[in-house]
Amino acid sequence: MHIEKLDFENSPYLGVYGTATDRVALIREGLGEKKLEVLREVLKVPLIETSIMKSRIVGVFAAGNSNAIVVPWYIWDAELEHIQNELNELDIDMRIEPFQSTLTAFGNLILANDKAALISVKFTREEAKKLEDILGVEVERGMIGDYHAVGSVGVVTNRGGLVHPEATDEELEWLRDLFKVDIYVGTANMGVPFVGSCMLANSHGVVVGHLTTGPEIVKIEEALGFLD
């Protein structure tokens, strides 16, 4: 199965509590084994349960792709060591990079796949260059609709992408050219346009908030490349 509905302690905002790449997913601590098993089955990658800065909103703070995951500079040493040890045990050669910036909500501010990354205009050009080196892809600063929190209003994988309904046709064309995948507009969780906060997705599958409707699921499947 490449799509499932789930809640995290009755919250439909799954993207707030984790981030997924094609190699690994970081997930908040404290979820039951049944929910972890759904995530493993759909995303088809190992899960690393962690906190970031002693917080469960892992998906707000972390963002990345198959090359690296960026976390706040203020991540606790024990948390960073735990994530790195888990990666080493899994034999996954991937950077977990504490990034020094006045910004910390990288999950809200970075939208990335293995081809490119779109980052908030609140990052400086110097920071954009550093993120390009870390993530190993082309990085552009920009907005989607009137929103600088591009990670909140979008989700993108190596198969496709879904963004806020207020994205213009010109922005969609630009995003398709940047990420090298088809990009659609849509919502989740009964009309919520902040789709990045509503789901966990990679090239293998997508887990959406439990309030997501049937028509929304069809659009999500189409956007993320799961409809034949």
From Swiss-Prot:
Q: Which InterPro entries match?
A: eIF6
Query: Which gene carries the instructions for this protein?
Result: eif6
Per the record's keyword annotation, is RNA-binding included, yes or no?
Answer: no
Q: Which GO terms describe its biological process?
A: cytosolic ribosome assembly
Q: Which Gene3D superfamilies match?
A: L-arginine/glycine Amidinotransferase, Chain A
Q: Name one GO molecular function term.
A: ribosome binding
Keyword Protein biosynthesis set for record: yes
Alphabetized, the UniProt keywords read: Initiation factor, Protein biosynthesis
Question: Could you tell me what this protein does?
Answer: Binds to the 50S ribosomal subunit and prevents its association with the 30S ribosomal subunit to form the 70S initiation complex.
Tell me the NCBIfam families matching this sequence: eIF-6 (TIGR00323), PRK04046.1-5 (NF003129)
Domain of life where this protein originates: Archaea
Give the protein's recorded name.
Answer: Translation initiation factor 6
> Which species does the entry assign this protein to?
Thermococcus onnurineus (strain NA1)
Q: Which HAMAP family match?
A: eIF_6
By sequence similarity, the record places it as follows: Belongs to the eIF-6 family.
Check the record and name the CDD domains matching this protein. Answer: IF6
